[in-house]
């Protein structure tokens, strides 16, 4: 992210991605932090104030519902989608007791979020999809299906610090290999 860009953090709570974006952009530009749960937005506002960040505004709403005023407006759109959380099970062991039905409904929600988020990306802009799970059903299968339906997007490589290094546009981080939580990230560029 660069100073002066417009960024939409579609599933923003608790705000860490928005704060990181603001720092990367030197607090110059516009970051809209959106979340379904209005009560969580107060924490983002408080965090931004505590950090002295003025580029962040908040907006409550369902990321699956189209907002015409945001159409093709953002240089970067972040979708850190609700997921099973299986990548962070060592930190939150109660995850293992979630209903199995969630594993079938989550990809539907994730796909709807991604499809709607795509409408907000300006030509030449970037759409980033991430989850804290390691399940292909919530990760590669969601982004593969999205790209099959959206020819105006393609994966775009990115670089992370070693030991990861260069990627070809998507990556699953594994606790046993990378010393991190389990995590998936896919970067897609709009042509």
State where each predicted segment sits:
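S-adenosylmethionine
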Residues: 1-191
């Amino acid at each position: 992210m660069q100073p002066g860009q417009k960024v939409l953090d579609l599933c923003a709570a608790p705000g860490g991605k928005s704060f990181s974006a603001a720092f990367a952009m030197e607090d110059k530009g516009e970051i809209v932090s959106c979340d379904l749960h209005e009560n969580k937005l107060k924490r983002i506002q408080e965090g931004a104030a505590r950090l002295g960040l003025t580029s962040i505004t908040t907006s409550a709403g369902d990321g699956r519902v189209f907002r015409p005023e945001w159409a093709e407006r953002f240089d970067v759109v972040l979708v850190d989608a609700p997921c099973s959380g299986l990548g962070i099970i060592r930190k939150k062991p109660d995850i293992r007791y979630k209903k199995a039905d969630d594993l079938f409904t989550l990809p539907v929600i994730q796909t709807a979020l991604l499809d709607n988020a795509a409408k907000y990306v300006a030509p030449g802009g970037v759409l980033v999809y991430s989850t804290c799970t390691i399940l292909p059903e919530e990760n590669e299968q969601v982004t593969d299906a999205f790209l099959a339906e959206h020819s105006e997007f393609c994966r775009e490589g990115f670089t992370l610090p070693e030991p990861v290094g260069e990627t070809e546009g998507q990556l699953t981080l594994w606790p046993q290999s990378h010393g991190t939580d389990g995590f998936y990230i896919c970067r897609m560029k709009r042509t």
